[in-house]
Design a protein with these regions (language model features):
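Short helix-initiation/N-cap motifs at beta->coil->alpha
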Residues: 234-240
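Extracellular glycan-binding segments that recognize GlcNAc-based cell-wall polysaccharides
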Residues: 256-258
């Protein structure tokens, strides 16, 4: 019996000793990790933002497969936070040459301008602006220096929209869409009742696109320090070579992405400068600043 209690007591003591050692080990690891984090916190960084991956309007949380998608709002908040962070020296952007939503394009532009207001630089590199609309270009036009690969071209175009019409389809199945439509410019129902654009629908769509286009041209002209006529002239006469885009002040330098990246590193302070993605930097608890997306 005595041997039994001795074994039980020894087991209990052993368990407590094990957990004590385990807790102490975690505390040591935490202390070392904190010290390393403190050391890393002294590093200086250039933030990097890859707009080619596309951005959601708002963060949608983690996906089943892959990482959490970046969002326009989190990106804007992160840049607003970074402008007052002394460890962040600048921003390096990979431009989107495919397409971008109007609100996202304008929000990123304002976020870049807000970041620059602290005196920090923004360097953007584009592999080319070929076959894309004016919106991805407008997003980065406020960069301090806009680089483009010299082997590509500049063919930023205007805007267009497409609508599908199912008028007459339902009738083939002895069905009839019943919708209330108030005035001719309330055109949501036209998708199901018309076979093409009505005059009012076409006017509304054209007016909307013209407003977006004119606004983008004005902002680009402001950012590039040229007239709106000059911007429209190069857009209307596209495509252009990289050299022609440089002469027209639509880009500032020609070079490959590695050259632009190293240029940003040197501008920030040299080889000791590290790069950190805007997503990894994160918005923190910063809810200041205006967002429109």
């Amino acid at each position: 019996m005595r041997q039994f209690f001795t074994v039980v007591f020894g087991t209990v003591v052993g368990i407590f000793a094990f957990f004590f050692v385990l807790i102490a080990l975690f505390m040591i690891i935490g202390a070392v990790g904190g010290a390393m984090s403190s050391m890393k916190a002294k590093d200086s960084y250039v933030l990097s933002l890859d707009l080619r991956q596309g951005l959601r309007d708002h963060s949608a949380g983690a996906t089943v497969f892959g990482s959490t998608p970046s969002s326009v709002v989190d990106t804007a908040r992160a840049l607003n936070r970074a402008k007052d962070d002394d460890l962040i020296k600048g921003l390096f952007i990979r431009a989107n040459q495919f397409g971008m939503a109007p609100a996202s394009s304008e929000e990123i532009r304002w976020a870049i301008k807000d970041f620059k207001s602290s005196g920090k630089f923004v360097i953007t590199h584009a592999q080319g602006f070929e076959g894309t609309s004016i919106l991805p270009y407008r997003a980065v036009s406020a960069s301090d220096e806009l680089w483009m690969q010299d082997t590509t071209g500049f063919a930023v175009a205007g805007l267009r929209s497409e609508s599908e019409f199912y008028g007459g389809v339902f009738e083939k199945f002895d069905a009839k869409p019943q919708m209330e439509q108030f005035y001719e410019y309330k055109n949501a129902a036209n998708t199901y009742t018309q076979t093409g654009f009505t005059e009012a629908h076409r006017e509304a769509a054209t007016s909307y696109l013209t407003s977006l286009y004119d606004g983008a041209v004005e902002q680009i002209a402001e950012d590039r320090g040229i007239s709106t006529d000059a911007v429209e002239s190069i857009l209307m006469s596209a495509p252009h070579s990289a050299e022609a885009a440089l002469d027209a002040k639509m880009v500032d330098k020609m070079g490959h992405v590695e050259e632009a990246r190293e240029y940003a590193r040197k501008k920030a302070g040299g080889d000791s400068i590290k790069f950190k993605t805007v997503k990894a930097y994160g918005p923190g608890n910063n809810y200041s600043g205006k967002t429109i997306a």
